[in-house]
């Protein structure tokens, strides 16, 4: 659910809620300068993972800083709803690239 209007507010904010077991695909926030994303965890429990790194358990009050050009995914744990505020960091030549799904094998191995 968007909290700001693109073109009216220079920073895009959205309230995002995942049902248990739901996660987004791997994706990248591209920018030639600046850019990236912030996740402000507000409810439930979730996961955040950067490519090649261990997944991080997320709980309310945590903030995740995701630099531009970092492939990652985020979503709910298998047994919990999860909500966060997504903040698109302003930058130049920004665009999102959606990649492959997070496999069930990778996701279920997280516990």
Indicate where each model-derived feature is located.
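A short glycine-rich, His/Asp/Glu-containing loop-to-beta-strand
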Residues: 1-28, 32-35
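A generic "binding-loop/recognition-motif" signal
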Residues: 22, 54, 70, 78-80
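Glycine-rich beta-strand-centered segment in the early N-terminal region that forms part
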Residues: 27-29, 51-54
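Short acidic-glycine-tyrosine-enriched beta hairpin
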Residues: 52-69
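Double-stranded beta-helix
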Residues: 8, 73-111
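Short, conserved beta-strand element in jelly-roll/cupin
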Residues: 15-19, 30-48, 87-90
């Amino acid at each position: 659910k968007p909290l700001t209007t693109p073109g009216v507010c220079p920073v895009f904010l959205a309230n995002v809620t995942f049902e248990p077991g739901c996660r987004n695909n791997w994706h990248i926030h591209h920018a030639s300068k600046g850019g990236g994303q912030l996740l402000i965890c507000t409810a439930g429990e979730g996961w955040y993972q950067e490519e090649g790194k261990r997944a991080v358990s997320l709980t309310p009050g945590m903030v995740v800083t995701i630099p531009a050009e970092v492939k990652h995914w985020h979503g709910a744990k298998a047994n919990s709803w999860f909500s966060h505020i997504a903040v698109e960091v302003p930058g130049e030549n920004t665009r999102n690239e959606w990649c492959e799904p997070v496999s069930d094998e990778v996701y279920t191995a997280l516990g």
